[in-house]
Amino acid sequence: MRVGVLEDDVDHAVLITQALHADGHSSEVYPTGARFLQAMVRETFDVLVLDWMLPDMTGIEVLDWLRQLEDRTPVLFVTSRDTENDIVEALRHGADDFLVKPPRRTELLARLKALKRRAESFAGVGVLAVGAFEFDPSSSSVRLHGELLDLTERQFQLALVLFRNPGRLLSRQYLLEAVWGLNAQVQTRTLDIHVSQLRALLRLSDNGWRINSVYAHGYRLEPLA
């Protein structure tokens, strides 16, 4: 799981990241809303952790910006604000969950994992049908107009991540961790080669799709205009 953390308090940021790393997850920490918003243009995360009070803006303002851009990444607020009105306001603006500082490590991890599972369940865990494509995670197989295509396991996993997120810009780091794992020593060039192979193997352009390369950011699967 890859987690983006918006937190200006160093001690709380360390608490959150240590809990994540000890459990085998990765994270990036941003101390201001401006730096976080800049990063969200190029980075991709499974879950976001937002503080409320920040040096330059509020976590609510950051959340509004994300939702206005139709970014549906699950959001957990971790804040010292603890009134019922605070919780209601965060949820009303699109937060998915709420924890009061300091969070207990086990509860923090449990809530983050639950948010990730919920997002994955909405994306679908069975056969994924997108246009003429059918992806079956149970057999790591993909069919195009009913024809079984010959893909390696890595090629299939990469295609599945892309087709589960059509229209979403996925960072290179996110794709590397999603397909090759957190600790894999894989160069970004390997990812680029796999993307190039997928374009041909899936016959994307002939079937109304393309994988758009966004310079210095990553890739986006999108329908042809």
Regions found by a protein language model. Give the residues of each.
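Short coil-to-helix segment of the ABC ATPase nucleotide-binding domain corresponding to the Q-loop/switch region
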Residues: 106, 168-179
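Short, Lys/Arg-enriched segments at the junction into DNA-binding effector domains
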Residues: 2, 113-169, 173, 221
